Structures are given as C-alpha cells and as structure tokens.
Amino acid sequence: MKLSALSIIFGMILVMTIMYTKAEAEAEAEADADADAKAEAEAFWGTLAKWALKAIPAAMGMKQNK
C-alpha cells in the first residue's frame, strides 16, 4: 500500500512539474512574440517618420518654387 501511495505522489509531482514547465515555456514564447510585434511596429513607425521628414520639406520646396 505504501509503495502504491508513493508512486501516486511521485506521479503527481512529475505531472505538476511537466505542466509548470510547459506553462512557463508558453509564457516565455508569448512574451517573445509580444516583444517581436512591438519591435516590428516601432520599426514601421520609425521608417515612416524618417520618410516623412525627408518628403515634407521636399514637397514644401516644390510648392515654393512654383
């Protein structure tokens, strides 16, 4: 009987450890995906701002020359 109870306890600990490890890995993957999405958005807006800073003065110069 004692061996059977110990086996059940060991099995429960093993399952809990696996579930915890899986949850931790999923949380880490989600955090990485969020960081990648944020970096991608920042890169997009940064590129757009650089383009606008170059295009606006050029467009204003074209209006003044006419």
Curated annotation (Swiss-Prot):
It is found in: Secreted; Target cell membrane. Belongs to the non-disulfide-bridged peptide (NDBP) superfamily. Medium-length antimicrobial peptide (group 3) family. Ponericin-W subfamily. Expressed by the venom gland. This is M-poneratoxin-Dq3a. It comes from the Eukaryota. Its main location: secreted. GO terms for biological process: defense response to other organism. Residues 1-23 form the signal peptide. Residues 24-43 form a propeptide. GO terms for cellular component: extracellular region; membrane; other organism cell membrane. InterPro entries: Antimicrobial_4, Pilosulin. It comes from Dinoponera quadriceps. Keywords: Antimicrobial, Membrane, Pharmaceutical, Secreted, Signal, Target cell membrane, Target membrane.
